[in-house]
Structure formats: structure tokens, C-alpha cells
Amino acid sequence: MWSTRSPNSTAWPLSLEPDPGMASASTTMHTTTIAEPDPGMSGWPDGRMETSTPTIMDIVVIAGVIAAVAIVLVSLLFVMLRYMYRHKGTYHTNEAKGTEFAESADAALQGDPALQDAGDSSRKEYFI
């Protein structure tokens, strides 16, 4: 039933001692010895086990995953670069033309034609 394999493929039985509080009963233990390694594995004299070589299907699956990740990364790079260059320089300010030569900010804004009222000049708005 339960066995432990040693490096040289012999089996040792595990000790199953009965519980001291239980009545004694006869227990039969089966041990098995395995003379050869498991199928699909080839044993080495020093106790190492060599795994089987990967199949073609394993290689195809791994290559597909790597290709999908590469395509996603290239797509993201393309989208990021396109977005960066498309929006480069689109920040516009609405400053009045010729304000760099004015003596003060008020004088520059008084001469700006975009800020002149076409109608009533008696109404003024003050910002505090």
C-alpha cells in the first residue's frame, strides 16, 4: 500500500503503528518493489531522472504565445507613438497678440480687439 522508493529502486515499508488506545488488530501490509523506473522516464546511475523531450505540440503552443505577446507589444508601441506625435504641439493659448511690448497687463488687454465690446461701453466688469 504505502512504500518509499530508495535511490536503487527498492521499496521500504512505512511503519504504521496502531494507536495505543485502540484494541490490537492484525494489519496486513503490502509492499511492492519496482525494478525499473516509471515509463517515459529514463534513469541515470547516480539516481537522477531525465524527463522526456518536449513534443512538437508543446513547441507550437509556446511559439504561439510568444508571437501573440510580441504582436500585442508592437501594437501598443505603435498606438503610443501615434498618439504622442499626433497631439504634439496642440496646446494653444488664447493670449492677445502684441502683449509682449505692452507696459502692463492692463494696457495690453485694453488694446486687444478680441476683448473690445461692440455695444455699450458704460457697462464694466471688475474682477477682484
Swiss-Prot record:
Residues 1-12 have a biased composition (Polar residues). The chain crosses the membrane at residues 58-81. Keywords: Blood group antigen, Cell membrane, Glycoprotein, Membrane, Phosphoprotein, Sialic acid, Transmembrane, Transmembrane helix. Changing residue 8 to S: Webb (WB) antigen. It is found in: Cell membrane. Residues 22-33 have a biased composition (Low complexity). Glycans are attached at residues 3-4, 6, 8-10, 15, 24, 26-28, 31-33, 42. The record marks 8 as: Not glycosylated. It comes from the Eukaryota. O-glycosylated with core 1 or possibly core 8 glycans. Residues 1-57 are extracellular. Coiled coil: none annotated. Residues 1-48, 108-128 are annotated as: Disordered. Changing residue 23 to S: Ahonen (AN(a)) antigen. It is a single-pass type III membrane protein. Glycophorin-C is expressed in erythrocytes. Glycophorin-D and IsoGPC are ubiquitously expressed. The keyword Cell membrane applies. Its main location: membrane. The modification Phosphoserine is found at residues 104, 122. One of its GO terms (cellular component) is membrane. PANTHER family: GLYCOPHORIN-C. Belongs to the glycophorin-C family. This protein is a minor sialoglycoprotein in human erythrocyte membranes. The blood group Gerbich antigens and receptors for Plasmodium falciparum merozoites are most likely located within the extracellular domain. Glycophorin-C plays an important role in regulating the stability of red cells. This is Glycophorin-C. It comes from Homo sapiens. The gene is GYPC.
